[in-house]
């Protein structure tokens, strides 16, 4: 019996950590700033566990019955936590209240589990052995969960089904305990019925997981969701309405097929057309292949390397018929080489030189992306360019995120490079900004590809003129150890979204 109860410790430790990871991941997906979200979720969860452990002192008789009930409650609340949070984000204005309330409730219940189980084991081991065995299995369970979560659960099950699976494990522990401790459970039939009810609810939730996600996302997106994928790095959603296809990463719009050509023509051609000798081009980010499509409009280009972290992103835009139609089959071109790796690490490892680089990362909404907008990153990138080479960076909105935009400019300049900022109007985004960086002064091109839909030599100079409400403001450069850009970005966009 004792080994079976210790196995329960392993399982419930795994469950508790998975619920915590799911809450932190969902908060990062939906609210951004992963450091803040994980810090506050973990802090709330640990404090709640402390409350649960303190409350366990008031549990006197009926330890086995109360342990089973706690397991069922953890399984029910934790199992449905992800589904509740998805729906709450879409339909309530108090998502943070729901988030921390759920984290607190689950934390209190998990905090009750181990003290109750230790008291159940004290008649079978010496106290020192109880503590040693329970904590050993508790930590091993946490290790297993921390490995399973990013490698198996998120990419293969998604957040909703992962939570439900571990809810079923909690319920399974409750059923197992009623069999192991049947002599200490006077109301065993009632507990069996409660366990069965919880299992049935969780199974129904599992079967309805896709529908739950549809309900949650139907209010997040104005158009119909035609594809949704969870990867170890992000949630990819495609929506469609008539001939307008839109890509969202972690609920943030990346492009609309109706006007993305404005963004991508402005991103690529002002810089690349000014480099008539460029033959080798590097693309960092841009896993949709749309920047590559624009690069290949220059017949002189001999080689393009695209580095994107998420293999599912590049696979999707290499195989999906509507998406390959949009990027003109860019990834099938023999001149294009795709590398799925962290761009920062890849720059440190490779020694290849490129004549021009396009940096097309998502906005710096969290620190993992913010590191790709730092002096350290731009310095590493510059080492892969010849003396007359250049790069261009998408740099958020100079109108809606003015400090963020000029922070990118300041950061490029702090790397001892010359920065040439410009902007363009994209209906799906509004005013959007870019920065060309290099060691030599930038001069606007005298020719452009002939098949552009938006950009012309006549309109190009206007992109480099900023009206008073978008002109430069005093900001700090974005360094790796401070990442002030993430704070600027969060403050500015939070102010707009209120």
Tell me what each language-model feature is.
Residues 440-498:
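SAM/dcSAM-binding transferase cores
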């Amino acid at each position: 019996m004792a080994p079976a109860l210790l196995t329960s410790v392993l399982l419930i430790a795994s469950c508790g950590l998975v619920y915590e990871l799911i809450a932190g991941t969902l908060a990062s997906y939906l609210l951004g700033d992963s450091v803040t979200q994980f810090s506050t979720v973990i802090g709330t969860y640990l404090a709640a566990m402390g409350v649960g452990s303190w409350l366990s002192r008031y549990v006197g008789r009926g330890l086995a019955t109360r342990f089973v009930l706690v397991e069922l409650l953890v399984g029910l609340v934790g199992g449905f936590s992800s589904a509740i949070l998805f729906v709450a984000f879409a339909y309530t204005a108090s998502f943070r209240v729901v988030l921390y309330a759920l984290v607190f409730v689950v934390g209190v219940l998990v905090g009750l589990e181990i003290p109750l189980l230790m008291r159940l084991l004290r008649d079978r081991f010496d106290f020192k052995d109880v503590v040693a065995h329970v904590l050993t299995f508790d930590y091993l369970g946490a290790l297993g969960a921390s490995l399973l979560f990013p490698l198996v659960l998120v990419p293969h099950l998604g957040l909703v089904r992962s939570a439900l699976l571990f809810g079923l494990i909690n319920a399974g522990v409750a059923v197992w305990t009623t069999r192991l401790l049947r002599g200490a459970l006077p109301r065993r039939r009632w507990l069996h019925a409660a366990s069965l009810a919880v299992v049935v609810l969780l199974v129904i939730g599992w079967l309805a997981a896709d529908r739950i996600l549809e309900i949650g996302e139907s209010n997040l997106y104005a158009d119909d969701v035609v594809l949704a994928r969870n990867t170890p790095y992000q949630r990819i959603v495609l929506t469609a309405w008539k001939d307008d296809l839109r890509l969202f990463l972690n609920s943030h719009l990346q492009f609309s097929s109706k006007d993305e050509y404005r963004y991508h023509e402005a991103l690529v051609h002002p810089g690349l057309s000014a480099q008539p000798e460029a033959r080798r081009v590097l693309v960092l980010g841009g896993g949709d292949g749309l920047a590559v499509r624009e690069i290949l409009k220059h017949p002189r280009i001999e080689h393009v390397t695209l580095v994107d972290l998420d293999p599912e992103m590049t696979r999707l835009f290499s195989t999906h018929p509507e998406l390959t139609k949009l990027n003109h089959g860019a990834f099938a071109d023999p001149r294009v080489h795709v590398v799925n790796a962290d761009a920062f690490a890849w720059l440190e490892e490779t020694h290849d030189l490129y004549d021009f680089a396009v940096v097309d990362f998502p906005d710096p909404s969290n620190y993992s992306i913010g590191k790709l907008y730092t002096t350290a990153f731009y310095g590493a990138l510059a080492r892969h360019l010849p003396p007359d080479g250049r790069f261009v960076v998408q740099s958020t909105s100079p109108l809606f995120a003015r400090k963020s935009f000029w922070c990118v400019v300041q950061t490029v300049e702090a790397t001892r490079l010359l920065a040439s900022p410009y902007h363009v109007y994209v209906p799906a985004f509004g005013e959007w900004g870019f920065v060309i960086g290099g060691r030599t002064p930038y001069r606007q091109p005298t020719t452009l590809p002939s098949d552009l839909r938006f950009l012309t030599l006549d309109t190009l100079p206007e992109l480099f003129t900023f009206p008073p409400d978008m002109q430069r403001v005093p900001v700090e450069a974005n360094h790796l150890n401070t990442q002030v850009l993430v704070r600027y970005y969060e403050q500015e966009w939070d102010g707009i979204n209120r």
